[in-house]
Amino acid sequence: MTRTYYISALAGILTAFMLQGCYKVSPHGYKELAQITINATSDTINVNLGTELVYNGLDIVSSKETTFQWAYGQVKTGTVPEQHQFEKMEVISTSRTINYTFSKVGSFLLRLRVDNGESIEFKYFTLNVNSGYDEGVAILSNDGDGNGSLTFVKTLTAEESAKGEQHVFTNIFSVEGKTLKNGTSLYISDNTYSKITYSGFLIGTNDEDGTIYHMDCKTFELYMTAKMKDFGSYCEEFGGEYAEDKASFGCFFKSADGRLFRYDMNGGFISEITDAPFKITRIFDGTTKGTSTTAKSTRYPLFYDSSTIGIRKSASAGIRTNSEEGWEIVNAGAQRVSSNAYIHVLFRSKSDPTSYKTKVTSSSLSAWATKTEEINGESVKMDVEYPFTTASLKMDSHSKILGNRVSSDVYYTYDNAIYRWSLTSAPGNNPAIKLPAGEQIRDIATNFKGRKASDGEDRLYVATYNPSRSGDHKGSLYVYRYSDDTLVASYEGICDDPSSVIYKYRIN
């Protein structure tokens, strides 16, 4: 039997964790209650599915004999792990150690209760029961004949790193009777409604059926498939959802011929959004960050053509649009450090191609944001906009704009380089990140950790293709740090020609 062991280190270098009990000392001579101190080697415990966890990583100090209880369960819906609330607890040990084999993949809250008859202390852990592909970077790529592969660069746990375990898997797509062909786009999401989780890792393709693969987020096993051939097209790009604890949970995507579709994560069916007022040029998810600890990041579907930007926030609200007469849309991006869903749209004048301006939506996204200024002694209400002129804009409609939770700037791609943009000024002339010579940028992503995750989205992933690279695989992954644009890691020659890259975050 395979076992995972956790052994206590020296007490002098351990992290102490103690919750104060009811210790009473009075001038009248009341007895002081016997204290308990719990020291643990780590606040996170990792174990693989089906592997027995043998945990001995504790130092407990008590002057009296102690009893123990270990219990685990999922974090209560609507709370965060730091609040230490369970949906339901299961006791797995009543001894000092754990000897237990878990049968369910996911991230759980683990609680230790220590009682010496006078005091009770608690220690909480994050318990990760891993499937093997729990967290990391997924790259969808195709060779010259359209044969697809799903490469996975695994984010290793501390224990896996110490053991030097493998973390690059060239192709993890394995579905009996299915061949991945002409992969186009990736998407991942999870939503819980009435204690039912709707989740999925989606793969869009341009195969003969226009297949969309709905994979299990924990194991990459096939859950179901849907076909776009009945609509005469295929999924070109995923982009957004409306899933704020609503039963009508779905992911939106753009077809190759510019139509808007929705994939239902529960039923697995595809429906066309027929009230879309125009053919779509691009689609992206407008992600915004909530301010409270339990707020979710909402990824609304945003899409635009040459003159109008649209959003569908919910099934009942329909599609809202904004445009600007006499101007055409160059590109658009979402501001992510605000609690509101502000979208910045870059326009170019139809009469003067050197004249540009950025306009901002209101927090409801239903109109342009406005401001009031004093002009000739009168208060005048006007739209918020940031004009500038340039004869050589380093951005076009093919540039992918990507925001993050830790910076008011966005990254975007142009001419095989990465630029930063504040969204309230002219885009820069000099790239923030230059890729190695010969690398052609195919897609970028951040380590977005999911709708309920805390902050910490601090990495940029760049999938590239170099036709001159030696060897069979000419696709690579470069990882950069947001804070200073420095290279963190590179994985060269690990895939074919990438079409999509995404961070596969941990999902329960």
Give the predicted meaning of each segment:
Residues G210-A417, W421-S422:
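Acidic, serine/threonine- and glycine-rich low-complexity intrinsically disordered segments
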Residues T4, Y23-K178, K452-E457, Y465-N508:
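Acidic/polar, low-complexity intrinsically disordered N-terminal segments immediately downstream
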Residues D143-G148, I196-T197, N206-D209, K218, ...:
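Short, solvent-exposed loop/turn segments at conserved positions within beta-propeller repeat blades
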Residues Y133-I139, S199-L202, C251, I343-V345, ...:
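Entry beta-strands of beta-propeller and related beta-repeat scaffolds
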Residues M18-G21:
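C-terminal motif of bacterial Sec signal peptides marking the signal peptidase cleavage site
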Residues L150, L186, N191, A332, ...:
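Hydrophobic core register within WD40 beta-propeller blades
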Residues V384-S397, N429-A453, T486-S500:
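Conserved blade-ending motifs and adjacent loop-strand segments that build the rim/top face
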Residues M1-L10:
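Bacterial N-terminal signal peptides that target proteins for export
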